[in-house]
Amino acid sequence: MSTPGLENLRAHYQRFAEDPSTLGLVPRSAAPYRLFAAAGLLALLVTWFAAFHVGLFERADQSVFLGFDDLSRQPHVSSLASFVARLCNPQPFVYLAVIPVSVALLRGRPRLAIAIAAVLLGANVTTQLLKPLLAHPRAAWVLGGRAPVAAASWPSGHATAAMSLALTSVLAAPGRLRPVVAALGAAFAVAVSYSFLALGWHYPSDVFGGFLVAATWTVAVVATLLGAEERRVRSAPHPRSVTPAARVSLRDALAPPGAAVLGAVALACAVAVARPHEVFLYARAHEAFVVGATAIGAMALALATGLMLALRR
């Protein structure tokens, strides 16, 4: 025997499970996301080729690596970097991965939760398969006798894990919170990447590769999800109308990423003011490091912000 309370609960769940609007990603076309996925694959191929077969980029890779390696010799840097980098070790990663999946489920979006799990699993398995497949000893012209990174290091598993967590958190978050989540997720991915670079685990190109694997998987899964939604809505005998949620203004969407940039600049200025002589000498001696570190930060913020803007309602 059913009760009114149970019937209401069943109807409530059925509405969440069937209404495409509950995914927070529709009504949208899957076509742009398919193009983004193709562009991600192309960028991944170009990054790999440059890292292994273009002398200019190989030299730059090593120079940035040296800058991070020398940074680890500063007081307390190594211990802090070790703590942050290990947040994306397998066991902590599994615990962190539960968060975006749980958020999607709590918001009544089971298909989105499955998509998020697919990104988190697929991206990281892909990286672990690519590393031995593409393993090749790196050139060490600039390293000055220091041991190069292991041959099976591209793409970085830690960078893939960090960026996949950042991007799936953007997917899971409510629309009005996505700008803040994107900024925080990018900051997390950058912090993890800087940390394992300082520990000498990877070259910077490994970070770019890991970021691109995570981003490509994210947009590919979103494209698949939206394609399935399009087919389901078209085949429904009585398609229900969807009232779009209030759209976040472009100004509000860009405010948190902008604040993240200003915060990074303010932090750099604070360090420079505290130790001006040391910072100036270090920057002069490691110009490639400054450029490379900036590029990693810019790429992380661009990927998280780009996804947030693409999903903006």
Residue ranges and their predicted role:
Residues L143-A293:
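Membrane-embedded catalytic cores of phosphoryl/pyrophosphoryl-handling enzymes
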Residues L44-G55, T126-A135, S195, G263-R275:
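C-terminal TM-helix exit segments that contain a strictly Trp-centered aromatic cap at the helix terminus
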